[in-house]
Every structure is written in structure tokens, then in C-alpha cells.
């Protein structure tokens, strides 16, 4: 039964990763903790290993369509890896509850914007008018901020990277997702290198989840290529809204626990 649950987790997480470029961990971690009944630390560490294979598989679809800007991907990766280390080292001294609320509000606004466009919330900035060097510097800063939030909150940065690339740097939704997957590979490798020493990685779950996740990541990436940018942005917006609502709920749930009162 555990193997079946792990396989279902791989199917859902892999498909979401390929479709949206957010790595799959955003969906996998809740499934691993709630559905597979893993402890939080083990779920995070195990998910990170799976995400490496999932992101590589999904990225191949974007690579074949030439939907990756490597200058931005490299700059984002450098910033994200550094930011993640900073976030992870300072997470115990920061008010996690407030950070989660801010993050959830940010994602909620972004989700509404991506689903309904400028008619409700206009967050657009024409980043295409920036010089190539300024876009690279901006990508480095976005990576630093996104990586730091990821390290602080124990989340993947894809939910931050993709909206920032679209709304700030004016990138097409497909290209933003392709870039995000490359960055996620870098950050997942960095995080896994640290986790290998912690003993939190469940190799059995990795073996069960990864194969279906890889297959569905490729399928998700292929389907994403069939959608126009506006439709794909709306799909991504729905996923981002889910992440925002889940973040609100988990923060509320923690606040009601006796040791948090």
C-alpha cells in the first residue's frame, strides 16, 4: 500500500512540475507528510532528491523548444544557491509565522494577477526595456531573494522565480518556467548535498516516487508546450493560489497548537 501511495505522489508531483516549472516539491511534500505519513524533515529531504530528477526530466521539454534563457538561468541559480544558504542559516532567528503570512499574501496577489490579468491587479513592469546586463543583475537579485525565502520557509523557489520572471522581467510564461526548472536543479543539488549528511533521505521512497514522477514530468512539460502563454499563466496562477491557501492554513494550524500559544 505504501508503494502505491508513493507512486501516486510521483504521478501528481511530476505532472505539476512539468506543467508549471515549480519543481514538484510544493505538491510532493504535503503528499509525503499527509498521504505517505512521513515526518516533515524526512519529507523535505526526500522530496529534494526526487525534484532533481523531476526537474531535469521536465526541463528537457523546454530545452527542446528552446524556451530557456541561459544567461538568466545562470544568474538566478547563483543568487538562489547563495540565498538558500543565508535563509537556512537564519531561519531560527526569524519570525516564521510573519514570514509565512507575507509569503502567502504575495502568492495570493500573484495568483489572482496571473489568472485574471491586468484587469484586476496590474503588477506588470516592462523588464524587456532593461539592458541585457541589467536583466542579468535583476535575475541575480531575484534568485537571492527567492532562495532566501526558500531557505527560511523550507519551500522551493519556483513559486517565486516564475512570477518574478514574468511580472518583473517580462519573460514569456514558457521561458520563465524553463528557467525556473534549471534553477531548481541547482538548488536541489545544493540542498541534497547538505541533506546527505543528515540521514533524513528515505531511499526507498525515492526509488518508488521517482520513476512515475519522471514520466509525468515529461508529459506535463509536453502539454505545457501545447498551451498558449495566457492559458499556461492561468494554470500556474491556480497552482500558486493553492500554495497561498495552504500556507495560510498551515500557519493558522500551527498558531492553534498549545506550544505556539
Language-model features: locations:
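Hydrophobic alpha-helical transmembrane segments of integral membrane proteins
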Residues: 26-27, 49, 159-160, 182, ...
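Membrane-embedded alpha-helical segments of transport systems
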Residues: 49-58, 90, 185-190, 215-216, ...
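Hydrophobic, membrane-facing alpha-helical anchors
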Residues: 22-30, 54-57, 129-139, 183-190
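Juxtamembrane transmembrane-helix boundary motif
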Residues: 1-15, 34, 40, 60-152, ...
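N-terminal signal-anchor/start-transfer transmembrane helix
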Residues: 8, 12-18, 27, 190
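Transmembrane alpha-helical segments of major facilitator superfamily
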Residues: 50, 75-76, 179-183
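Small-residue hotspots at the loop-to-helix junctions and early N-terminal turns
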Residues: 44, 174-181
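Transmembrane helix boundary and interhelical junction motifs in multipass membrane proteins
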Residues: 21-29, 152-164
Amino acid at each position: 500500500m505504501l508503494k502505491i501511495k508513493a507512486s501516486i505522489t510521483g504521478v501528481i508531483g511530476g505532472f505539476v512540475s512539468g506543467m508549471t516549472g515549480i519543481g514538484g516539491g510544493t505538491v510532493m511534500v504535503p503528499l509525503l507528510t499527509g498521504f505517505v505519513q512521513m515526518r516533515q524533515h524526512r519529507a523535505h529531504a526526500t522530496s529534494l532528491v526526487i525534484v532533481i530528477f523531476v526537474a531535469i526530466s521536465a526541463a528537457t521539454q523546454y530545452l527542446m523548444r528552446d524556451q530557456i534563457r541561459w544567461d538568466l538561468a545562470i544568474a538566478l541559480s547563483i543568487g538562489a544557491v547563495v540565498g538558500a544558504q543565508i535563509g537556512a542559516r537564519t531561519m531560527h532567528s526569524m519570525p516564521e509565522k510573519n514570514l509565512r503570512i507575507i509569503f502567502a499574501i504575495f502568492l495570493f496577489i500573484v495568483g489572482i494577477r496571473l489568472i485574471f490579468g491586468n484587469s484586476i491587479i496590474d503588477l506588470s513592469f516592462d523588464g524587456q526595456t532593461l539592458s541585457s546586463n541589467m536583466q542579468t543583475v535583476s535575475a541575480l537579485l531575484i534568485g537571492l531573494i527567492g532562495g532566501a525565502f526558500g531557505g527560511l520557509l523550507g519551500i522551493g523557489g519556483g513559486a517565486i522565480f516564475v512570477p518574478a520572471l514574468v511580472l518583473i522581467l517580462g519573460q514569456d510564461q514558457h521561458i520563465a518556467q524553463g528557467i525556473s526548472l534549471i534553477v531548481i536543479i541547482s538548488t536541489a543539488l545544493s540542498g541534497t548535498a547538505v541533506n546527505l549528511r543528515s540521514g533524513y533521505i528515505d531511499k526507498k521512497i525515492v526509488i518508488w516516487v521517482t520513476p512515475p514522477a519522471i514520466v509525468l514530468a515529461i508529459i506535463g512539460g509536453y502539454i505545457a508546450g501545447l498551451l498558449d502563454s495566457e492559458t499556461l499563466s492561468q494554470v500556474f496562477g491556480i497552482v500558486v493560489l493553492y500554495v497561498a491557501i495552504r500556507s495560510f492554513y498551515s500557519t493558522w494550524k500551527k498558531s492553534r497548537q498549545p506550544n505556539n500559544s
